[in-house]
Amino acid sequence: MGMSFSHLLIVLLIIFVLFGAGKLPQVMSDLAKGLKAFKDGMKDEGSDNDKKNN
């Protein structure tokens, strides 16, 4: 029950229409930075829990 290629294509088309070609690289860059910050935060949270358990 995952996303098929056609679903992904429709989502990308909607994003392209909403943001336009000019802003799309900036939006993707901001999204990547947000995901990286989230992953780093989750990794830091995991190491904090390990220290508390010892």
From Swiss-Prot:
Predominantly, its location class is membrane
| Membrane spanning residue stretches | 1-21
* Membrane topology summary: Single-pass membrane protein
Q: Where in the cell is it found?
A: Cell inner membrane
- Single Gene Ontology BP term? protein transport by the Tat complex
Database matches in Gene3D superfamilies:
1.20.5.3310
What keywords is this UniProt entry annotated with? Cell inner membrane, Cell membrane, Membrane, Protein transport, Translocation, Transmembrane, Transmembrane helix, Transport
Domain of life of the source: Bacteria
GO CC, any one term:
TAT protein transport complex
User: Which Pfam families did the record assign?
Assistant: TatA_B_E
Keyword Cell membrane: yes or no? yes
Key word Transmembrane helix present? yes
One Gene Ontology term of the molecular function aspect: protein transmembrane transporter activity
Subunit description: The Tat system comprises two distinct complexes: a TatABC complex, containing multiple copies of TatA, TatB and TatC subunits, and a separate TatA complex, containing only TatA subunits. Substrates initially bind to the TatABC complex, which probably triggers association of the separate TatA complex to form the active translocon.
| Protein purpose | Part of the twin-arginine translocation (Tat) system that transports large folded proteins containing a characteristic twin-arginine motif in their signal peptide across membranes. TatA could form the protein-conducting channel of the Tat system.
UniProt similarity note: Belongs to the TatA/E family.
The protein in question is named: Sec-independent protein translocase protein TatA
| Name of the gene this protein is made from | tatA
